[in-house]
Amino acid sequence: EKRYLALVEGSISDDRGLIDLPIERDPVRRQQMAVRLEGKPARSYFEVLEQFGDFTYLQAKPVSGRTHQIRVHFSFIRHPVAGDRLYGSTKSPNGLGRQFLHATELAFDSPLTGRRVTFHSPLPGDLESCLIWLRKRKGARQSRTSEQLRTCEGW
């Protein structure tokens, strides 16, 4: 089980949702994945954390774990991950030189003990600086706290 933090282009109107679209390798651009009817099932839950007008900061949980799943899903709904040129991003806030996508949590059941093991990774400094810049530039609307996200139904 993985959770990601992402900044996507545009304003997502729903505070939370599910993207349920099949994914497979793009037959023309072989280095990319694409939403295709004949693809493998892929589901991504998301919760909006903050809105910045032209960007939305969110937490995403891919259920199926397909290659580039979050990037493909959000690009398909016209909200590509900021800085992700491979999947259609045209905006990079505050000169960010990479895509704004970070694996913040990994959890699994230990094969030795059977207990749930969870690892957390804080947001890297460059991504945190980007958020600070966005908050100063425009007033952010906060939707959910991290603790509220962990208790959401379906997560």
Which residues are covered by each model-predicted region?
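RNA pseudouridine synthases
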Residues: 1-155
